[in-house]
A protein has these predicted regions:
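Extracellular/periplasmic periplasmic-binding protein-like sensory domains
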Residues: 253-329
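N-terminal secretory signal peptides and thylakoid transit peptides that target proteins
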Residues: 1-16
Length: 398
């Protein structure tokens, strides 16, 4: 299927390299203007990987485009339609900077939204903060994106990697006062930040880490690392991986007839993408720090909060595979963006947008697990702070 031009409305295409949701004409009084805001539209910019090594994550951008299309079809936000311009960065920091400058300086967007990856968001953060352009609800878990004192225009969404590592450490100690911990981690900022959090969570018991084995994403297998971790005598293993290596690790652990307590990174916590390939029997007992529902899990099919999600995806993304968690994540952060804009009313200055971002009070996002509420402040930019220990029972999470 050919690419979609920047000025095409193409929500149904799953190969769009740039998507624009064009507004309809409507004259109305406006109290305050901001770059990217007119009487009829609010321009939202994004660059994300529609090509390159992380192109699978382009589904996030497509889901967000489809969510904004639904909002436009229902009348928009306070009378304005969303003009969503999403460009391809190929998961290349240099390209991300180029596309971001284009969106800010040529397309005159009000905000940048939902960009993917730690290195890319770090690359564009200085520019956006210097221009006082909101960098909102990014798809990166580094603690570096929750520092409002230094970068007040940048905020993430998911739990930070460090906090997840801390959670693992505390949960391991809660289950065993004298554990032996093995770690499999991706050798980059993602894995290292989680490992640092694990040390913090274990506190004065951090010497309980008896072995730590690393890998790089292009490694064809991690079997040798798992063999070494078993030889260490570890009774608990933390998998700071994404789905591919997580599935490989769980399967190899089972093949070795090794039965440690397994703690899996939330980013790999998909039944269909990780546990099923590893084997449901092999995956039984796997623990995760849960915070978002898995829409492919039958447990949620009749969930009242997710009913709008299932209706939306059936209408706007009928070919989407529910086993890919990108779609629910895109729907969830799209809701965050729309809530903020609605709270702004007619004061759609960038300053007020950030004021609303920092003013969530017990906000309930229906994609999150029951009991998780969102609270922010000018000094606390962590959106999802709470996670819940979940265990796989062979069929679903409990």
């Amino acid at each position: 299927m050919p690419g979609i031009t920047r000025r095409a409305v193409a929500i149904g295409s799953l190969t769009a390299l740039a998507t624009t949701l064009a507004p309809t004409k409507r004259a109305r009084a406006q109290k305050q203007n901001s770059p990217g805001v007119s009487d009829t539209e609010i321009r939202i910019g994004q660059c994300i990987a529609y090509s390159g090594p992380a192109s699978a994550y382009g589904q996030l951008g497509r889901a967000e485009a489809a969510y904004f299309q639904m909002i436009n079809d229902s009348g928009g936000i306070n009378g304005r339609k969303i003009n969503f311009i999403s460009l391809d960065d190929g998961y290349n920091p240099t390209k991300a900077v180029e596309q971001t400058r284009r969106l800010v300086e040529q397309d005159d967007v009000a905000v940048m939204f939902g960009m993917l990856g730690t290195p890319l968001n770090l690359a564009i953060r200085p520019y956006l903060n210097s221009r006082k352009v909101p960098q909102l609800f990014i798809a990166a878990g580094s603690e570096q994106f929750a520092t409002p004192a230094k970068f007040p225009w940048t905020i993430g969404f998911q739990p930070t990697l460090r906090s997840e590592g801390v959670f693992f450490g505390k949960q391991i100690l809660a289950g065993n006062s004298d554990p032996k911990v093995g770690v499999l981690y991706q050798y980059d900022d993602f894995g290292k930040e989680m490992l640092s959090g694990l040390h913090e969570g274990l506190g004065d018991k951090s010497s309980a880490i008896v072995a730590a084995e690393s890998f790089i994403p292009t490694d064809p297998t991690i079997d040798s690392q798992i063999v070494k971790l078993k030889a260490s005598g570890a009774t608990a293993i933390t998998l700071f991986t994404y789905s591919k290596q997580g599935a490989q690790a769980i399967r190899k652990i089972h093949e070795l007839n090794w039965r440690p307590d397994i703690y899996l990174h939330s980013g790999a916590a998909s039944i269909s993408a990780t546990l099923a390939p590893a084997g449901l029997e092999a995956s039984t007992g796997v623990r995760i720090p849960g915070y978002i529902k898995d829409p492919s899990d039958p447990k949620w099919f009749d969930d009242a909060e997710l009913k709008p999600f299932y209706e939306w995806i059936k209408k706007y993304m009928p070919t989407a595979n529910l086993s890919e968690g990108f779609f629910l994540s895109g729907w969830a952060v799209g809701q965050m963006m729309v809530h903020v804009l609605r709270q702004c009313g007619d004061d759609l200055t960038r300053e007020n947008i950030m004021h609303q971002v920092a003013s969530f009070k017990d906000f309930r996002n229906p994609a999150l697990l029951p009991g998780i509420l969102i609270n922010t402040s000018p000094t606390d930019y962590r959106i999802v702070k709470d996670v819940i220990l979940q265990r796989f029972n062979g069929k679903n999470w409990e």
